[in-house]
Amino acid sequence: MKIAFLFPGQGAQEIGMGKDIYENFEEARNMYKYVQDITKMDVAKMTFEGDETELNKTNNTQICILTMSLAILEILKKHNIEAKISSGLSLGEYTALIYSGYIDLKEGIELVKKRGELMQNLVPAGKWSMAAIMGLENNKVEEICNSVKSGFVTPANYNYVGQIVISGEEKAVEEAIEKAKEAGCKKAVQLKTSGPFHTIKLKEASEELSKELKKININNSEITVGASIARPSNKKIQVIKNIDGKPYTEQDDIKEILKKHIISPVHFDETINTMLEMGIDTFIEIGPGKTLSGFIKRTNKEVKVLNINNLVNLEETLNYLKI
């Protein structure tokens, strides 16, 4: 069994996510407390009892999703379960880098908090939207975006073959949706997001994030050194990056990649293909929702796909991995 961990990004959040896991595992409660001590945010209260509008704000969403994933990782660590490879969608790439030993846990939490604040506060003025287009070829969606006359819109996430997320000005996204329907798309769905993420419109946020990245240490060696990390071993785990769907290497300038990450399209379709080529046969999505699990299943029906987002499927996954 060759396992990959997948970490979700923004849009997977919902009030109450992970509450039953929090209530039943001390390891999870300890992680929420750890994050609260670092960020001075009551992540548990915000996630379990808060207002949906507040949770959906980027500065809150990102740290809440990260915390849930980290809490579950602590439980998997207790059971000596770890991945050979990890990856995530957008925000989830940061979770993967923390888990895999590239970024220290404390510094990673601080960085994600700052990233969420920058992406919330430095969105240019205007009405922005994102939408998932299903059932069209990549080049057709790109052609549609280029043909829109009512404003800025561009592909932001290449999720899997047959699904692309577009991002841009609200009117332009709406026009692109209509053009996609005329072109025969199977479905077009607007997403729960509050900005033109993974587009050049977040250039100011990218520049400010770069200043924060300069303050942290990136571990490019094969061994995790001194990081309080949620893994049984101290050996580095490969991370597949969003920007091109390839593994990080020792030669990569990770800080520069993460600076570009915020304004560049996510190539999760290529990420999936890379993990399959590397022999992954068991994928475990860790965190709210099951979006990434769906991407894997639509790409390859032969591999085992599990997701952990509540107490029931956590226990099912633990039982399965004991085989």
Predicted features along the sequence, with ranges:
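FabD-like malonyl-/acyl-CoA
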Residues: 1-141, 222, 282-297, 303-311
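Cys-dependent protein tyrosine phosphatase-like superfamily
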Residues: 2-4, 234-237, 241, 247, ...
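Alpha/beta catalytic cores of group-transfer enzymes, especially the acyltransferase/condensing modules
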Residues: 10-12, 38-39, 100-226, 230-260
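Short, solvent-exposed amphipathic alpha-helical segments in soluble enzyme
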Residues: 22-23, 147-148, 181-183, 298-301, ...
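Glycine-rich phosphate/pyrophosphate-binding beta-alpha loops
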Residues: 61-63, 196, 265
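Non-catalytic positions within long, well-ordered alpha-helices that form the structural scaffold/packing
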Residues: 77, 181, 276-277
